[in-house]
Amino acid sequence: SDGRNVAAKAFHRIGRTIRDECCSNPACRVNNPHVCRRR
C-alpha cells in the first residue's frame, strides 16, 4: 500500500499541473469541464 500511496501522490502532483494548464486554456476547459470544476 505504501507504493500505491506514493504513486497516488505523484499522480496528484502531475494532475494538478495538467489541470492548471488545461483550465487556463479556454478550449481545453470547455472540452474537460470536470477537470476545472472548483469546490
Curated annotation (Swiss-Prot):
Modified residues (4-hydroxyproline): P33
Keyword terms of this UniProt record: Acetylcholine receptor inhibiting toxin, Disulfide bond, Hydroxylation, Ion channel impairing toxin, Neurotoxin, Postsynaptic neurotoxin, Secreted, Toxin
UniProt note on tissues of expression: Expressed by the venom duct.
Region (Ser-Xaa-Pro motif, crucial for potent interaction with nAChR) residue spans: 24-26
GO MF terms, alphabetically ordered: acetylcholine receptor inhibitor activity; ion channel regulator activity; toxin activity
InterPro entries, sorted: Conotoxin_a-typ (IPR009958), Conotoxin_a-typ_CS (IPR018072)
One family name in Pfam for this protein: Toxin_8
Disulfide bonds: C22-C28, C23-C36
The keyword Disulfide bond is annotated on this UniProt entry: yes
Other noteworthy facts: The mutant ArIB[V30L,V35D] is a potent and selective competitive antagonist of rat and human alpha-7/CHRNA7 nAChRs, making it an attractive probe for this receptor subtype.
Family membership: Belongs to the conotoxin A superfamily.
Entry comment, domain topic: The cysteine framework is I (CC-C-C). Alpha4/7 pattern.
Protein name: Alpha-conotoxin ArIA
The organism of origin for this protein: Conus arenatus (Sand-dusted cone)
